[in-house]
Amino acid sequence: MTKITVFGMGSFGTALANVLAENGHDVLMWGKNQDAVDELNTCHTNKKYLKYAKLDVNIIATSDMTKAIQFADIYLMALPTKAMREVATQINDKLTSKKTFIHVAKGIENGTFKRVSEMIEDSISPEYNAGIGVLSGPSHAEEVVVKQPTTVAASSKDKNVSKLTQDLFMNDYLRVYTNDDLIGVELGGALKNIIAVASGIVAGIGYGDNAKAALMTRGLAEISRLGEKLGADPMTFLGLGGIGDLIVTCTSTHSRNFTLGYKLGQGESMDQALSEMNMVVEGIYTTKSVYHLAKEKNVDMPITNALYRVLFENISVKECVKDLMERDKKSE
């Protein structure tokens, strides 16, 4: 039995906390929202994010950062990318011993263009850092929490951290593979959110399967081009952290990124769509980061560029589709 603190009380953090508790581990969740903490401790639910799920009664929650830090030596960082550096810095300020960090965020930091493991590494003093890893792949929280068969990848620069992650989470409904390509697994998880928003737009407009298939295929090509430029193994993008995550996020209404895109394709404004969803949509922030990163690295990413224009320059979605279709002739 291992003690684990889960930082973040969103849908995926909650679903994975439930996995860990059912695997026999002691789990403490930390969140800022006292109402959510009280609900979990009293009712064993988190209805804002997982409306119908009843959670393991052994999971406890707190809003006390010091208590959360002292509880365990392994931390599951289940926070939005934009909050990761701030919370990791707060944790670091209170640490007195080494901790292992496993994150499940899928984004790239605006401005620095850093992957999430790099953000954590920046924020945690070396004397307190026992290793950093990621758990990623095609894994909707809504399915994990009701024990639908799910398969993901664990990756780290330290093989011991990858193996630890595999051992902690794997059970009869959650299969975990290890993968040595941390860069590729993190980039696959982040970049697919861009394509998922675009895929939602295509569905919202009402285009058919041909367009959806083309978008995912050419989207994967963009992901691979940038990934290879940044040091990833291109083969990683044919695995769970790449095409696996891409498929599930581009084809399901469980996906916040797809849902946002669908609403935009239906004619809603971004502000209107986000107010209805009331959740963090990582693809917005990732699109902004990757648009500028691709220009810096001189990588051709036409779908990302088109989505950036829709999200940040108020170009109509149909105009962007037209521009994509009328690009210069090229070989595949």
From Swiss-Prot:
Binding site for NADPH: 11-12, 32, 106, 141, 256, 280, 282
Catalysis performed (reactions): sn-glycerol 3-phosphate + NAD(+) = dihydroxyacetone phosphate + NADH + H(+); sn-glycerol 3-phosphate + NADP(+) = dihydroxyacetone phosphate + NADPH + H(+)
Active site: 192
Keyword match Nuclease: no
EC code: 1.1.1.94
Keyword Flavoprotein on entry: no
Cellular component, GO annotation: cytosol
Record: residues binding sn-glycerol 3-phosphate: 106, 137, 139, 192, 245, 255-257
Location in or out of the cell: Cytoplasm
Pfam family, one: NAD_Gly3P_dh_N
Top-level taxonomic group: Bacteria
InterPro entries: 6-PGluconate_DH-like_C_sf, 6PGD_dom2, G3P_DH_NAD-dep, G3P_DH_NAD-dep_C, G3P_DH_NAD-dep_N, NAD(P)-bd_dom_sf
GO-annotated biological processes: carbohydrate metabolic process; glycerol-3-phosphate biosynthetic process; glycerol-3-phosphate catabolic process; glycerophospholipid metabolic process; phospholipid biosynthetic process
GO molecular-function terms, A-Z: glycerol-3-phosphate dehydrogenase [NAD(P)+] activity; NAD binding
HAMAP family attached to this UniProt entry: NAD_Glyc3P_dehydrog
Family matches, as NCBIfam families: PRK00094.1-2, PRK00094.1-3, PRK00094.1-4
Family statement: Belongs to the NAD-dependent glycerol-3-phosphate dehydrogenase family.
The name this protein goes by in its record: Glycerol-3-phosphate dehydrogenase [NAD(P)+]
